[in-house]
Amino acid sequence: MFPMVTEFMNYGQQTVRATRYIGQGFMITLSHANRLPVTVQYPYEKLITSERFRGRIHFEFDKCIACEVCVRVCPIDLPVVDWKLETDIRKKRLLNYSIDFGICIFCGNCVEYCPTNCLSMTEEYELSTYDRHELNYNQIALGRLPMSIIDDYTIRTILNLPEIKT
């Protein structure tokens, strides 16, 4: 055949292929048109987090035995544990415990490997501040329990469950 005819046939095939791809994308767009919006109006509405959500760490000072397992299993050696050895009872006494949430990656290793369960993950995820030094929590700040989203009457909670198609 003539080169001009084969180029015209290739152009026609490319046009049909491009039209098919555009049509497929348009059909996907149309399939999303009848769904509910997934956007949450944040300050006034909040999603209820799952039970296994890894939020801010809660620390119970009385349970800690200063074994430093949390520091050893942390990938970035983040928790700072200050202790003093009591020679008369031959045990460690915890003086200070702090975590910098500006550096923490919320992996949960410290919670998982703690032998006394003095660490736990909460549902609190609003940790933003204007000063990064405010993200360094000591044992007093870590000991505060967060206000539950469900108990706050000023916020409409939205349960985040997967939709069941019928």
From Swiss-Prot:
Keyword flag Phosphoprotein: no
Binding site for [4Fe-4S] cluster 2: C74, C104, C107, C110
Residue span, 4Fe-4S ferredoxin-type domain: 55-84, 95-124
EC number: 7.1.1.-
Reaction(s) this enzyme catalyzes, per UniProt: a plastoquinone + NADH + (n+1) H(+)(in) = a plastoquinol + NAD(+) + n H(+)(out); a plastoquinone + NADPH + (n+1) H(+)(in) = a plastoquinol + NADP(+) + n H(+)(out)
Localization per record: Plastid, Chloroplast thylakoid membrane
GO CC term, one of those recorded: chloroplast thylakoid membrane
S-S pairs: none
Keyword rRNA-binding: no
Cofactor(s) the record lists: [4Fe-4S] cluster
InterPro entries documented for this protein: 4Fe4S_Fe-S-bd (IPR017896), 4Fe4S_Fe_S_CS (IPR017900), NADH_quinone_OxRdtase_chainI (IPR010226), NDHI (IPR004497)
GO BP terms in the entry: photosynthesis, light reaction
Class in the EC hierarchy, top level: translocase
Co-factor binding comment: Binds 2 [4Fe-4S] clusters per subunit.
Record key words, sorted: 4Fe-4S, Chloroplast, Iron, Iron-sulfur, Membrane, Metal-binding, NAD, NADP, Plastid, Plastoquinone, Quinone, Repeat, Thylakoid, Translocase
Membrane topology, as annotated: Peripheral membrane protein
Annotated family: Belongs to the complex I 23 kDa subunit family.
Subunit structure: NDH is composed of at least 16 different subunits, 5 of which are encoded in the nucleus.
NCBIfam families: ndhI, NuoI, PRK05888.1-3
Function: NDH shuttles electrons from NAD(P)H:plastoquinone, via FMN and iron-sulfur (Fe-S) centers, to quinones in the photosynthetic chain and possibly in a chloroplast respiratory chain. The immediate electron acceptor for the enzyme in this species is believed to be plastoquinone. Couples the redox reaction to proton translocation, and thus conserves the redox energy in a proton gradient.
Protein name: NAD(P)H-quinone oxidoreductase subunit I, chloroplastic
The species this protein was found in: Chaenactis santolinoides
Gene name of the record: ndhI
